[in-house]
Amino acid sequence: MELYKKGYSARTIAKILGCSKSTVCYRLYKLGITPRRGLDLNPQEIIKLYQNGYTTTEIAKIMKCSHETIRRILRNNNIDIRKSSESLIIKNTKKINLNPSESLAYILGVLNGDGSVNKQESNYVIELKVTDKDFIEEFKRNLENIGFKYINEYVRKFENKKDQYVVRVRSKGFYYWYKSLNVDYYMNVIGNNEKLMISWLKGFYDSEGSVVINKKGNYVYKYVSIANTNRNLIDVCCSFLEKLGIEYSVYCEKNNRYKSGYL
C-alpha cells in the first residue's frame, strides 16, 4: 500500500515484490483501493526530474499524465513542492549565460551604478529603476541577451515627478555569482577585451554619467563626467579609459564623492 501511495503502479509493485500484477490488484481491492488505470509511472524518475529543476507541469508533459498526479506523487514521497516564485528563480538561473560577453559587461556596468542586486526574503532580485525609458529598454534587451526570459517590467506614476521605469528579474545563481565578483574580475577579464571594456563603460556611464558644460568668460568647456562614491569602481573606470587611449582626470569632492572626468 505504501508503494502504491508513493505513485508506483501495480505492475511495478509486482516486479518489486516478485509476484503477479493480479495479486497486487487483489490485495489493493481487499484494502478498499481501486487501482489506477493506464499509468505506469516511476516515482524515482519523477523525483529526479523535479530535483533537477523541472516544474510539475513540465514533468506531467514528459510523463503524459496530469499536473496533479505529479504533485501527488511528490507529496506522497515527502518532497516539498516549490512555490511559483522559486520555480521562476530556477528557470532563470538554468538558462543564464555568465560567460564574458558585451551584454554581460553592459549589465555589470549598470549594476555597478544605478542598478541593484539584493536578497529580499527568499527572493534574489536584480533591479533597475530609472526615469529614462531608452535606458531601461537597453538594460532589458541585454538581460534577454544573456538568457533572462521572465522579466518583470512596469511603470511607477507620480503626480509631481517623472514616471519611473522599473525592470526586475530574479535569479539565485546570478545573485551569488555577482556577489562573488571582485576588482580582479573587472581588471583581468573585462579589462583584457576592448569590446567588453567599452560595453562596461557604456553601462556605467548610462547609470552614473552626465555631460557637463561650463562657461568661463568667453570660453565654453564641455566634458563627460562619471561620479561614484566607490573608489575601486573609479579605478576600474580609469584603467579602461587608459587602455582605450582616452584622457581623463580624477578628483574627490569634499563629501568624498569621487568623480572621473575625461575629454
Curated annotation (Swiss-Prot):
InterPro entries noted in UniProt: Homeodomain-like_sf, Homing_endonucl, Intein_endonuc_central, LAGLIDADG_dom, Resolvase_HTH_dom
Pfam families, alphabetized: HTH_7, LAGLIDADG_3
Coiled-coil boundaries: none
Highest rank taxon of the organism: Archaea
GO MF terms, alphabetically ordered: DNA binding; DNA strand exchange activity; endonuclease activity
Domain DOD-type homing endonuclease: 107-246
Name of the molecule in the record: Uncharacterized protein MJ0314
Native source species: Methanocaldococcus jannaschii (strain ATCC 43067 / DSM 2661 / JAL-1 / JCM 10045 / NBRC 100440) (Methanococcus jannaschii)
